[in-house]
Every structure is written in structure tokens, then in C-alpha cells.
A protein has these predicted regions:
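A cyclin-like helical interaction fold
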Residues: 1-95, 99, 120-124, 134-158
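Short, structured motif recognition centered on aromatic/hydrophobic residues
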Residues: 1, 100-109
Length: 158
């Protein structure tokens, strides 16, 4: 999935192939280890064949898909992307996974912009626990003024 820039979490892969989460997680780790080993061998042998390029997984990777599933308008989807880029650039929440941060961003924006999107709704489309969404949201709240442009705060009466 990552090679073709269709990034999916291990949980999503488990759902697609009707696997348990543990098996999918182990499978993803094993696949990554195998790809890395093949690339290492190619470099060691100075082969000119193409190294497998894995696209980086960031919160931005998941924003568009999650916002689409939640019917979030383009303006607020762009705001979520803007926040994801700032978080990544400034390494603001390094302890959470990219898809958890994406879920937290969407909830954060939904609260600021008065959308009727609950943690449970985000959980249903992303499989991120409500506790994790809440923890990410609290971390984002600490950086609200640097993450949300003043014009958006004004527009949504914050």
C-alpha cells in the first residue's frame, strides 16, 4: 500500500483481509523488514536495480480520506491539512501515530468550528479509540493559537 501511496493502517488491512489485528500488525512489520532487507542487499551488492521507495506516513496521509468520510467541507478539510503540516513540521505530537493525530486534528477542528462530529463518529471511520482522540485533542488545544489562523477563529466565533 505504501509503495503506491495508498497508505492503510494495520487495522484497515486486517478489515480488508478479514484478519485479526495482531496478525495484520505482525504481517505489516514482517513485510517492512523484508523490503528493508532486500534494499540493504541491493545496496551491499551495488546493484543498479531500483530501491523500493516507501511513502512516508504522516497525519496528512489520512486527513483527506477521513474528512471525506465525515462529509467535512473543502475549507475545513484544508484547515485540517494545514494543521497536520504544522504539527509535522514542528514535531508537536511525536508520541502519537499519524492516523491518531489525524483523528485528533479532525475532532479539534470540529470543536472549534462547531461541527456536529463526535469522538464516536471519528472512531467509527478511523478505528482510533475515543481516549486517543481526546488525548490528541488536548495536546492540540495547547497550541490552538499557533495552529488555527485568526480569520478562522473569528469566522467561527472563537
Amino acid at each position: 500500500c505504501r509503495v503506491n501511496n495508498y497508505i492503510r493502517t494495520a487495522k484497515e488491512i486486517a478489515d480488508i483481509f478479514n484478519l485479526d489485528n495482531t496478525s495484520a500488525t505482525k504481517g505489516c512489520k514482517n513485510a517492512l523488514a523484508i523490503i528493508n532487507e532486500i534494499d540493504r542487499e541491493k545496496r551491499d551488492l551495488s546493484e543498479k536495480s531500483e530501491i523500493i521507495k516507501l511513502n512516508k506516513t504522516t497525519p496528512l496521509t489520512f486527513i483527506e480520506r477521513y474528512c471525506s468520510k465525515l462529509n467535512i467541507n473543502n475549507e475545513l478539510t484544508q484547515l485540517c491539512k494545514f494543521i497536520a503540516t504544522k504539527i509535522e513540521k514542528n514535531n508537536l505530537i511525536p508520541e502519537n501515530t499519524p492516523h491518531s493525530i489525524a483523528g485528533g486534528i479532525i475532532y479539534f477542528v470540529s470543536q472549534i468550528c462547531n461541527l456536529n462530529i463526535t469522538k464516536a463518529t471519528i472512531n467509527n471511520i478511523s478505528k482510533i479509540s475515543e481516549v486517543t482522540i481526546n488525548k490528541c485533542n488536548k495536546k492540540l488545544e495547547q497550541h490552538k493559537n499557533e495552529l488555527i489562523p485568526a480569520v478562522i477563529l473569528k469566522k467561527y466565533n472563537q
